[in-house]
Amino acid sequence: MKANTMFIILCLSLSTLCVSSQSTSVHGKIFVPNRAVKLSSDGNYPFDLSKEDGAQPYFMTPRLRFYPIGKRAAGEMEQSEGQNPETKSHSWRKRSVLTPSLSSLGESLESGISKRISINQDLKAITDMLLTEQIQARRRCLDALRQRLLDLGKRDSDVSLFNGDLLPNGRCS
């Protein structure tokens, strides 16, 4: 019973939120409570996503901009946006194809791939080094065990020194 009443209260509160966020008409004008007004890249063409100011439809469509990762990390996007030929014109008809941004994206992808390859090579070198150290430690352990058995005079042909089970804990004594 409590779950049903909670569900009904939740639905009613969500429906009132949805109704209050929609646009209302007063004296023939449309008022939108939360208007999303954005500026173009040069700041001269403000457009409203509610289409009240008669902006061109291609101004309202968001454009994807690709910047080199170095500029993003250094925070140089805002300063270099004025020199960028993609952001100087707004119209899709006047803009050229995104070849500069795609080439910079390709360069960053190539640098990421080369970094990943170098990291993989470093990891392989580290694992090889660890494996050779383990092999050398195992050989030293076997040599020490062989010497101890020889010293004690208990060298027997049935004893296998090259299996991995030297001691129950896997170490030399």
UniProtKB/Swiss-Prot annotation:
InterPro entries: ELH. Residues 75-94 are annotated as: Disordered. Keywords: Amidation, Cleavage on pair of basic residues, Disulfide bond, Neuropeptide, Secreted, Signal. The modification Leucine amide is found at L152. It is found in: Secreted. It comes from the Eukaryota. Disulfide bonds join C141-C172. The atrial gland peptide A and peptide B precursors are the source of the 2 peptides that, upon release from this reproductive system gland, initiate the egg-laying process by exciting the bag cell neurons. These neurons, clustered in neural connectives near the abdominal ganglion, in turn release other peptides that act directly on the ganglion and also, via the circulating hemolymph, on many other organs to control the physiological processes of egg-laying. One of these other peptides is the egg-laying hormone. Injected in sexually mature animals califin A excites LB and LC cells of the abdominal ganglion and causes egg-laying. This is Atrial gland and califin peptides.
